Curated annotation (Swiss-Prot):
Signal peptide: none annotated. GO terms for molecular function: agmatine deiminase activity; protein-arginine deiminase activity. Homodimer. It is an enzyme of class 3 (hydrolase). Gene3D superfamilies: L-arginine/glycine Amidinotransferase, Chain A. This is Agmatine deiminase. GO terms for biological process: putrescine biosynthetic process from arginine. The keyword Hydrolase applies. Belongs to the agmatine deiminase family. Keywords: Hydrolase, Polyamine biosynthesis. It comes from Pseudomonas putida (strain GB-1).
């Protein structure tokens, strides 16, 4: 499909909010043995559970490598789940897939951001990453969507949350990190976000969740639930390393107005744990130079904020934690018109993320 030389904003396109109607959700089948334990088999089982949970509400497309295609196809043998073959380096389609944008005339296009595995050779999580860099373009080709390419600008989809009405929330920890776009300052990065997402206001939270190996992705920490309202990971424990991060974010949100001039309504979501991998879980991960080391002493960045909104549903992680029930109740109260489905999130978390990181929604065309 055609790669355009303009920007979504110039062409009348914008990134819609996650609660906008969707045609499908994209996923990628996990298999990387230096990230997922036991050759990825427990993570694959978790992906089957996730795909089937989403498929109750809308179609799912799962991309699998040639070597895993038949295995994935057999395990995902369900009418609402399509399996396609796309070579990849890992399963984080939120960060490697396209950011879909829409206009008011029923068209859907996609933004193909630069990708460097969360930092390249300065703190990145694996190398090479060339197949992941190509994944967004292949998805857009399959969907016959025209493509915008941000040549020389690195961004992961997990580092942004939009309200669809002109505001994006992100973190300084990630977007201003020297290992993403060191040649650009804050103002230049904001200009790219305005052009590619068609937003007017960029809300900068200082940091994401403690020990998030993506350098503080906002989708693990603070997300939009409706225009003017966000859900923020929260702890009242002053000894928790997340305490300062949560309170700093709250200060920004309390003193910021969105693109429509609204004050933010902030809902608090408890943080599970602290959660740690067991020695046995860590031992199941292949040790490869340049890949993220797994260590039972390192706290996992578990978060209930890492959920996905689908048509009529909320797909959220549970952690066999005392806070699971409270998290479910909070989501049910915030989303009264959605069915809250919680699925076990531990295997996904052991790989470095969760449900939102491992999914990418494709918005439905809109005609006004």
């Amino acid at each position: 499909m055609k790669t355009l030389n303009s920007t979504p904003r110039a062409d009348g396109f914008h990134m819609p909010a996650e609660w906008a109607p969707q045609t499908q959700v994209w996923m990628v089948w996990p298999e990387r043995p230096d990230n997922w334990r036991l050759g990825g088999k427990p993570a694959q089982a978790a992906h089957v559970t996730l795909a089937k949970a989403i498929a109750r509400f809308e179609p799912v497309t799962v991309a699998a490598s040639a070597g895993q295609y038949e295995n994935a196809r057999r395990q995902l043998d369900q009418p609402n789940i399509r399996v396609v073959e796309i070579s990849n380096d890992d399963a984080w389609v939120r960060d490697t897939g396209p950011t879909f944008v829409i206009n008011d005339h029923g068209e859907v296009r996609g933004v193909d951001w630069g990708f460097n595995a969360w930092g390249g050779f300065d703190g990145g999580l694996y190398a090479p990453w060339n197949r992941d860099e190509e994944l967004a373009a292949k998805v857009l080709e399959m969907e016959r969507c025209q493509r915008y390419q941000t040549e020389g600008f690195v961004l992961e989809g997990g580092s942004i949350h939009v309200d669809g009405e002109g505001t994006v929330i992100t973190t300084e920890e990630c977007l201003l990190n020297r290992n993403r776009n060191p040649h650009m300052n804050r103002e230049q990065i904001e200009a790219v976000l305005r052009d590619q997402l068609a937003v007017d206001t960029v809300v900068w939270l200082p940091d994401g969740l403690f020990n998030d190996e993506t350098d503080g992705h906002v989708d693990n920490f603070c997300c939009y639930v409706r225009p003017g309202e966000v859900l923020l990971a929260w702890t009242d424990d002053s000894n928790d390393p997340n305490y300062a991060r949560c309170h700093a974010a709250m200060e920004v949100l309390k003193n910021t107005r969105d693109a429509k001039g609204r004050e933010f309504i902030v809902h608090k979501m408890p943080i599970p744990g602290p959660l740690f991998a067991t020695a046995e879980e860590c031992a199941g991960v292949d040790q490869v130079a340049g890949s993220q080391e797994r260590d039972p002493s390192v706290r996992l960045a578990g978060s209930y904020v890492n959920f996905l909104i689908v048509n009529g549903g909320i797909i959220a992680p549970s952690f066999d934690d005392p806070a699971d029930a409270e998290a479910r109740a909070i989501l049910a109260k915030i989303f009264p018109d959605h069915e809250v489905v919680m699925i076990p999130g531990r295997e996904l978390l052991l790989g470095g993320g969760n449900i939102h990181c491992l999914t990418q929604q494709q918005p439905a065309p809109v005609k006004r």
